Amino acid sequence: MKNPTKKKTPAARPKPLALRSQAWFDNPANADMTALYLERTMNFGLGFDELQSGRPIIGIAQTGSDIAPCNRHHLVLAERVREGIRDAGGIAFEFPIHPIQETCKRPTAALDRNLQYLSLVEVLYGYPIDGVVLTTGCDKTTPAQLMAAATVDIPAIALNSGPMLNGWYEGERTGSGTIVWRAREMMAAGKIGYQEFLKLVASSAPRLFCVV
C-alpha cells in the first residue's frame, strides 16, 4: 500500500538556455526542430559546430540601399560592424528592413516609420537573433528600430552616422534643407534662374541624412 503522506520527488527542471538562438540550434528538449533548423541554416554556409558553439548570433538591421540614399553609407559601415562582431566572438547575420526615403515619398513619414518598426519586430521575434546592431539615421529610422528592439526585448546597439553636413555654394554656407526655402524665394523674386536654383539646392545635400 502506498504511503499517502510520502512526497513525490519533483521532476528536474530543464536548464535555462544561455542564448536565445539555442532554442533554434541547440535545444535538447526539442531535438527534431533543432535538427530541422540546423539543416536549413547550414544553407547560409554556417557549420554544425559553429551554430552549436555557444557564440551569440548578432543581427545587423540594414537600412541602406540604392532606394534610400539617406542611409546608403550603412552598406559600407555594416562591413566594419560585421568584422567587429566576428572579432568579439559573435556570428553576424545582416538583413534588410523596410526602406525610408522621405524626400521621394511624401507625406508618408509616419507610415514608413511604422512599417519599418513592424517589419523589424517580425524579424527579431521570428529568427534566431541574440542581439542586434541597428543602423539608424533620421528621426524615422531611429525611433522605429529602437521601438522594435524594445518590443522584442533583446540587446541592441544603435549605430547612427550623424546628420548631413552643411554644404557650400560660391564660397557661402548652404544649410542642410533650409536653403531650399530660401532658394525658392530667390527664384520667385527673379534673383536666380531655374538652373541656378537646382545647383544651389543640390549644394546643400553633400552626404548623409537630412536634418529637416
How would you describe each model-predicted region?
Residues K2-R55:
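N-terminal amphipathic/basic leader segments beginning at the initiator methionine
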Residues L17-P28, I58-S65, F95-P107, L124, ...:
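Gly-rich Lys/Arg/Thr-decorated short loops/hinges at beta-loop-alpha junctions or inter-strand turns
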Residues N27-A31, H73-R113:
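Anionic-ligand anchoring segments at beta-strand to alpha-helix junctions in alpha/beta enzyme folds, i.e.
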Residues R40, F44, E79, N114-L118, ...:
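Short, contiguous clusters of charged residues that form electrostatic/catalytic patches at enzyme active sites
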Residues A110-V212:
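Active-site cavity-forming subdomains of large catalytic enzyme subunits
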